Amino acid sequence: MVNGCRVRSNLLDIQRNSFRSFLKKGLVEELRKIKDIAHEGFRISFQTDNVKYKKPKISAEFALKNGETYSLSVHIPVEVTYNNMFLVRNKYILFAKIPLMTEKGTFIFNGNKRIMVNQIIRSPGVYFEKNRYNDSIFATLIPTFGSWLTFKIDQDEGIFVKVDKIKTAIPLINFLKCLGLSRKKFFLYLNDPIFIETLQESESYGIRLEFFEFYKIFFPNEVNVRFGNARKFLRSKFMDPRKYDLGEVGRFRVNTKIYRSEFFQSNRTLQPEDVLGIAHYLIELKKGMIPFDEIDDLKNKLVRSIGELLQSQFRIILNELESSLKEKLIFLYKNPSEKTFRLSRFFNSYFITNRIRKFFSVNPLSQLLDDTNSLSELTHKRKLSPFGPNGLNKERTKLDVREINTSQYGRVCPIETSEGKNAGLILSLAKDVRVDKYGFLESPFYKVLRGKIETNKGIYFISSAQEKYFTVAPFDVFRSSQSNLLDKNKLLGVKRSKIFSYSFSKNIDFISISTDQFTSLGTGLVPFLEHNDANRVLMGSNMQRQSLILLEKEVPFIKTGREALINRESDATVLAKSSGKVIYSSLKKIVIQEEEYCANIEFFNKNYSFFNLLGCLNEISQKNFKLIKKVNQKIYFLESPKKSNHGVYIQKIPIVHEGEWVRKGQIIADGMSTLRGGICLGKNVLVAYLGWEGYNFEDAVIISERLVFEDIFTSIHMKKFKTFIVNDEKKGENISMFIPNASLKTIKNLKNNGIIKIGSEIKAQDVLIGRIKVKLKNTPKNKMLIAFFGNKVRKDVSLRSPRSLVGIVTSVEILCKKSNCSVLIHVAEKRRIQIGDKIAGRHGNKGIISKIVPSIDMPFLPDGTPVDMILNPLGIPSRMNVGQVFESLLNLSSLFLKERYKIQPFDEVQTSMNSKSFVYKKLNEARKRTKKDWLFNPNYPGKAFLYDGRNCRPFDHPVAFGYAYILKLIHMVKDKIHARVTGPYSSVTQQPLRGKSKNGGQRFGEMEVWAIEGFGAAYLLQELLTIKSDDVLNRSEALFSLINGTYFSKPNIPEAFKLFILEMQSLCIDIKIFTNNYKKFD
C-alpha cells in the first residue's frame, strides 16, 4: 500500500528499477555461480562481493555524435593460486563493459538510441490444459531456466513425458525411476491399477534400461553408452542448480498447486515428488474433479524488463567463460614450460563485452527508439512483447492469445495494440500500473468499507492473483459528493472472480482510482473516447505516435490531463533537478544557481521558493539561530540540433530567462513536440463535414491554400550524409574544391578544403564533399590521354546531394579515430503539406489530401471565415467515431469563449448524456456572448448554412463544422513517389529492378494487362510486354528508330518467356520455340 490519496505515475520506473536491480543483485548472483574455477591445483577465484563500477569516460551526447557506445566498466578482484601459492592476489581486472541506461531509460549503442522492450511471458510454474481438438489433457512444467517438461495423459490413462520440443516420449514410471523415486512413494501416491501393473512389468528390466532410454532421446545415434554417463547426464539436466532452476516464483507456484503445504522452499531444482504430484493432478483432472488453468490470465504471466533479460544473458555468457577458463587451465597444466603466469593473456574483457554487444544488436527486443515525437518515445518504452527468448513464435500464435482477458483491466490497455499480424500480441501498459519484485502487474485501487470510499487510507496495488478474492468496481459508478456510493439498494457494475456482474455497494471491496487508469498513454490523449468505436480509438492512438513535429507548434483546445505527465517523463524536455535562480540561458546551456539554507530546522519541502523561505525564517525567533547559505551552480547542457531515428529534426529550446526562479521538477527546456508543458502533435484548423465535387470521396481530404503558404502544416526533416576522407595522393584520392567538369552552381558553396559551408542552401546534385580520384594504372588509354593533355586522368567521385533534396546545411563535423577520418553533414529540409500526404485526427479519422483549393473558393461561414479543410461526412456513421463531432463543436465554443477544457473519459458519472449537454451549453453560451446566432441553432444544433466560395450561394442543407485537432503523419508522398527514365535491369529476366532504393521501375502486372485487354488495345499491350519491357534486341534499337524516324522492328520473344522455357526444360519437359517457318528459335 502506498500512503497518500493520489498516485504519481512514474512511467519509466519499470526500466530504471530493473536495470538498477541488475547492477546491485542480478550480476552478483550470476558471478557467484562461477566463484571458483579449479583444475589440478590451479584455482581462479572471483571476489564477487567487491565488484566495482566505473562511470563512462565520455558523455551521452558525445557518444551520440561520434557513433560510440555509452557504457560503464565492471571491475572484479581476482585471485589465482597454484597448490595454495598465490600467483595473483586480489587484483582488479576489467571484467566487461555494459551499456549504461540513461536517465530517460534509453541506451546509446553505436551512436543510436536504443531501448529494450519489456517482455511478457508465461510465469515459471506448472500449468494444466486441455486440448480442444482431441480432448487430451496435458501439463507443462516451466522453469526459470532449463528444459521444459510436458506431461500428457492418453486415453488408456497412461502418462508420458516429453522434454522440450523433442517428439519422442517416455513413460512416466520410467522417468520417475530415473529421478530416484522409491517404490513405496509411488504406490502411496499413485495407487491406480494401471500404474501398478505397468510398474510390475518394468521392474523385470532393471533401472539401467530407463537411463539408457532417456539418454537415447537426446543422442539417438550414439552407441556404446556407459551407464555412468547416462546417469550423470540426467542428473545434470534436472538436478544441477546451474542448469535447471524453477526460481522463487516457479517453486512457489508448484508448491501451492500440488502440495498441501509448502515443501522444498529452498530447493529449486526438479524433485521426484514434483513429478509425482503433477501425475496425481492429471488423474484428478481426468476424473473431472478440479478445473483447468486459464493460461492467458495475467496471474500466469510476468514481465521481464532489461534487468532480467541481461541477467539471463549473463548466465549463458558466464557458462561459456567458465568453459573457456577451464580449457586454458588444462592447457597451462599440460605445458609446464609456461613458467610466467600472465593474467592479461589468460582473461580478456572482450570475451564478455562482444557477447553483450551482440545481445544488444541481435536480440529482437532490442530496438531503435521511435522518437518521432514525445508520445511515440514513451509508448515505445512501455510496450509489452511476447516475442524474444523463451517467448512465443510469431508463426504459431493462436487466437486465444490475442483476445482481451478480464484480468487486463487496469494493467494492460485493452485498446492500444499493433495493427496487422501482431494485433493483440504487442500490448501497451496502462497508465498507473506497477510491476512487483517478481514481475507481476499490479493495478491501484481505493479501499471501500461499507459503501464508503476510504481515500485517506491510501492506495492498494492488487495483482490479478489477489483480485479474484475481492469485488472491485470501476470509478464511474454512481456516487454522492461525500464519496459514498449512491443508493445502497441499487445494483452497481462490479467484477468478481474475472466475471463482470452487478452487486450492491455493501459487497464492494475496492474501487478504481480514476476513470482512465485502464488506458495507455496514447489512448488517454483521445477526448470523448467513450463515444468512439474501439477500433477507431486504436487507430487514433497509433496515429498520434506517427504525427510529425510541425514548424509552428500549437496545443489543442481540449486536453485530457495526460499531456503534463508525458512531458515530464519524455526525453524531449529538461527538468530542473533542484530549485534556484537562472543566471544564464541560451540554446547551448542553462545555468541555475542553487541556493540552500541550512539551519537548526529542517525543511521537508524541497520545492520551496526563495521568498517563501525568507518569510518562514522571519517568523522564527533569531535567538541562538544560525543561518548558513550554500550556493552551487548546476549546468544543464542542451543537445545541439540532430536527426531522430526517423529523420525528424530535433532540438531543445530553453523556456526560462535570466533572473527567473525555478522550482525542482519544473520544465526549463522544451522539445520540438512540446510547448510550455503542453504536448503539440498537430494544429487546430476549421473543418466542415461536406461533400465537395467528389474530391473527398472515400476519405480523401480537401485543404485550403492557406495551410500551405502560411506553413500551418510545415515540418522540418533532417538528412545525414557521412563519408570517409582519404586524402592520400599515393592512393590516388584527395579532397578538393577544384572538381573536373563540375559547373560553378554545384561547387559554389564549397570551402577551400572541399567541404561545404554551414548554412549553405543546397539543391539537387550539389556537391557536399569534393573528392577526386586519379587513375594510376598505366593502361594504353591513360597513356594516350596523358600524352595529349599532359595531366593525369582524374575522376569525379564527389559526394552529392540526392535529386529530390532541397535544404540547408545545419552542421559539418569532422570525426577522427586513429588514422581514419570521416565527415558528417546534416541537412535540414522544410516540407510543406502537399497532395498525397496523409493527415488524421485523434479519433481514427484519417485521409489523403486530394486537392488544394484557393482560400477564396473554399466554403465560408456566415461571418465570412473560409474553411481550412473539408472532410467527408459519410466517414462518421459507418466508423462510429462520433467523438470527433463533440471535439470539433467544443473547440468552436472554446475559440469564441477563449477558454480551454480538460475532458476526462467516461465523464457521465452523475448524469447521462453529460457530454452532449455540456457541448450544447457551451455553444449556446458562445452564441449569447458573441451575438452570432448561427453558432447554435436549436433546430439543427452544431450546424449552420455555409456558403460556396465560388458563387457565394448557400448550400442546400445545414453543414456541421468546427475546429478539429489535425495531425500530419510521417507517411509523406515525397518519401514514396518514385519515377525513372533509365536505370538498372535484372540480369535474369532483363526487366527493371523493383523498389525505390534500387532506382527500380514500375512493373506492368497481371491486373494491368487485364485493363488493357478490356479496352481492346492490342498493339499497345504488345508494345508494353515486349519493347518497353524485356525484348532486349528491339529495346536497344528503339532509340535509333526514334532518332532516324524509322519504324520499329517487329517484336521479338521477351526474355521472361525464354526464362519460362528454360525452367520447363529444367523439369525434363522437352519444349522449344519455333517461328512461323518452323525454324527453331534460340
UniProtKB/Swiss-Prot annotation:
GO cellular-component term (any): DNA-directed RNA polymerase complex
Keyword Nucleotidyltransferase in record: yes
One GO term of the biological process aspect: DNA-templated transcription
CDD domains named among the record's database cross-references: RNA_pol_B_RPB2
A molecular function GO annotation: ribonucleoside binding
Quaternary assembly: In plastids the minimal PEP RNA polymerase catalytic core is composed of four subunits: alpha, beta, beta', and beta''. When a (nuclear-encoded) sigma factor is associated with the core the holoenzyme is formed, which can initiate transcription.
PANTHER family, per the entry: DNA-DIRECTED RNA POLYMERASE I SUBUNIT 2 (PTHR20856)
Protein name in the entry: DNA-directed RNA polymerase subunit beta
Organism of this sequence: Euglena gracilis
